[in-house]
Amino acid sequence: MNGRVQPRLMLGFLLILLVILALGSANMGALSLSFRTLWNTSTNDAMWHIWLNIRLPRVLLAVVVGCALAVSGTIMQGLFRNPLADPGLLGISSGAALCVGLIIVMPFSLPPLLALYSHMVGAFIGSLAISTIIFTLSRWGHGNLARLLLAGIAINALCGAAVGVLTYISDDQQLRQFSLWSMGSLGQAQWSTLLVASSLILPTCILGLLQARQLNLLQLGDEEAHYLGVNVRQAKLRLLLLSAILIGAAVAVSGVIGFIGLVVPHLIRMRIGADHRWLLPGAALGGACLLLTADTLARTLVAPAEMPVGLLTSLLGGPYFLWLILRQREQRSG
């Protein structure tokens, strides 16, 4: 098929691109840092502190969160057998955001590390609850895409209204924290944040990669997958749980960053095909590259100020989503 490339070549290209982007991103920002400057500077200098304790954790967190969002999106699209099944569009990210918002506006404060864990638990509970609702509605509607998207829109609206109530009752400090977090930002990246997020996201991504065969068989339909030896109910519940963990961990540390789970899997699928043995690792690398690029632009476009990275991904993903809908409509009419 035109435009297709060998999966191994694509994965190799994405890996090299990710390394280049990571090295470039670590040196870019309000203060430009080159490796030559760092080499000629004492390790006690402020430049080393900026690079080691601010830039590097943020770059690595962008890679980890990008992997989580893209792998989660790939799993959801495979689970629902539709390329429009994105965690953000279906309201899963909104559910996670609502639970974290409830924790932010609690009348008592928590120690930083305990607060991070509570955010992750809340985001996981919210994403799992909405995922279960969406999955149930999908079964009731026999997989009808229109009903699924309408359900996602309704859930997004309900969660958005609840978030609005939380915003209204929050004080100034809570409002500032919640507003920045709800637009998506990696500005709070620290080594402790990276360690906690990585300890959840990386093992879950590996477990997701191990589900590639089940995802491939589920594309044939539930009955066919069952005849080929797949316990369909357990496989779907397992995939739903993995996706909820990934979304919960990502939302807890970075806020709501949309459209990566929609755009990246579709782009990778167009290049290497729908075999999840290659699609899942390709999406992980592609998601890391895209979020790292968006975060670098967020730090540099209006330096020394900073844009929420979620705004940039939405500016990219919104038009792409409209194009995808029009493209599917043309394919049906053709």
From Swiss-Prot:
Signal peptide bounds: none
Predominant location: membrane
GO biological process, one term: siderophore-dependent iron import into cell
Family annotation (InterPro entries): ABC_BtuC-like, ABC_transptr_permease_BtuC
Alphabetical keyword list: Cell inner membrane, Cell membrane, Ion transport, Iron, Iron transport, Membrane, Transmembrane, Transmembrane helix, Transport
Compartment annotation: Cell inner membrane
GO terms assigned for molecular function: transmembrane transporter activity
Gene Ontology CC annotations of this record: plasma membrane
Record Pfam families: FecCD
Coiled-coil intervals: none
Bilayer disposition of the protein: Multi-pass membrane protein
TM ranges: 9-29, 60-80, 96-116, 117-137, 149-169, 191-211, 244-264, 278-298, 306-326
Family: Belongs to the binding-protein-dependent transport system permease family. FecCD subfamily.
Function: Part of the binding-protein-dependent transport system for hemin; probably responsible for the translocation of the substrate across the membrane.
Protein name: Hemin transport system permease protein HmuU
Annotated organism of origin: Yersinia pestis
Gene: hmuU
